[in-house]
């Protein structure tokens, strides 16, 4: 049955590992076509230490940061260690937004994605979406505080300022919490783009009682 094939196709596409490695390799190969960001060039310090959540070698190749000063906390291209997913128990997909009148003019209503899926009448479509959500939930990554600690210990890092750029601050809370506990008197600079990221940062600051934060809109 062609309708059953919808569900079967979802099951086939459950393994994203190969796609992730291919995506990361292509992104790394494209670095030769990317120009340095002016603001980042001002922010980055060649003597600083960097925790990047990026798989690619952007810092090394575009901004000439020595590789010894960089920790790829989620893995890096060229190594068999790429991680994808959410911290366990922290799966928070975006809400589903739809036009209540179906005329393209609103009003627009937000609902939890799983609530929307449960309301789909078509069995095949509902089952396919449920399979996809379940697979997304299964993609979780372990927090590697041990890697972060070893990196900081090895480099004997004495940190006075912590700069956060290009991170949504919606996940990876444990890393920020560890840094705040280890360097409790450090000055924090959060570069944010948009209201949602700013809200995430404010929550992060409040939850971790960060003493000296500064939020900079870009």
Residue ranges and their predicted role:
Residues 5, 56, 62-64, 135-148, ...:
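Proteins with a high burden of low-complexity, intrinsically disordered sequence enriched in S/T/G/P/A and R
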Residues 21-23, 53, 91, 139, ...:
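Phenylalanine-focused residue identity feature
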Residues 121-146, 209-218:
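Extended charged low-complexity segments that act as oligomerization/scaffolding linkers
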Residues 28-39, 136-154:
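A Trp-anchored, charged/polar loop motif used as the substrate-binding/catalytic surface
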Residues 21-22, 41-46, 133-135, 159-164:
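N-terminal start-of-chain detector that recognizes signal peptides
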Residues 1-128:
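Extended, H/D-rich, highly charged conserved domains that either
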Residues 144-218:
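SIR2/sirtuin-family catalytic core signature
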